[in-house]
């Protein structure tokens, strides 16, 4: 849903600023760039199957604070960041109209590598669940996109699935 229905950049910006502010820390553009570098590397390692998602989310702020010499609990910070991210509900333009149209003609499903609690919260807050037949989240399945095992699991759990008539819409050529 990030980058396809929701504006992840806006949600991330909101969550970063709110979490830093709540901890009385200044989020400068330089700090954000360092975070993005660390986060991007971790997600790339996740996509390659080198690390799991828990390692991604629970080490990025630990690494950031260590690099910056900031005495802050990165794990607790991550929990607060995820809560704030889960409340960053910014739909992309025309998302509802597209969902309304497509859901009347096709069965829609969510397939995501996002953090489960964050994804469920945003779908609920935006009342988007009604458009989807099911939600497939990598941390619940045990395999991440784009691993074939992830998609095989999804396909097995979709009644009357036909890959010749299916379309997956994503925001990344490396993870979708």
Regions found by a protein language model. Name each.
Residues 12-17, 54, 58-62, 116:
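An amphipathic alpha-helix signature
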Residues 76-79, 84-88, 95-124, 132-138, ...:
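Substrate-recognition element of Asp-dependent hydrolases with the DxDx(T/V) motif
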Residues 144-176:
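Conserved Lys-Pro-Asp/Glu-containing loop-to-beta segment of HAD-superfamily phosphomonoesterases
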């Amino acid at each position: 849903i990030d980058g396809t229905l929701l504006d992840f950049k806006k949600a991330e910006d909101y969550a970063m600023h709110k979490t830093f502010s709540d901890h009385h820390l200044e989020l400068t553009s330089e700090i954000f760039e360092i975070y993005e570098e660390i986060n991007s590397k971790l997600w790339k390692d996740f996509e390659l199957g080198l690390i799991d998602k828990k390692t991604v989310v629970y080490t990025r702020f630990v690494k950031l604070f260590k690099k910056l010499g900031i005495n802050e609990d990165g794990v607790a910070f991550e929990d607060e960041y995820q809560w704030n991210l889960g409340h960053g509900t910014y739909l992309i333009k025309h998302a509802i109209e597209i969902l309304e149209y497509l859901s009347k003609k096709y069965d829609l499903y969510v397939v995501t590598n996002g953090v489960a609690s964050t994804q469920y919260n945003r779908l609920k807050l935006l009342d988007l669940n009604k458009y989807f037949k099911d939600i497939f989240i990598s941390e619940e399945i045990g395999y991440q996109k784009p691993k074939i095992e992830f998609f095989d699991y999804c396909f097995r759990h979709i009644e009357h699935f036909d890959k010749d008539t299916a379309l997956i819409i994503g925001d990344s050529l490396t993870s979708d």
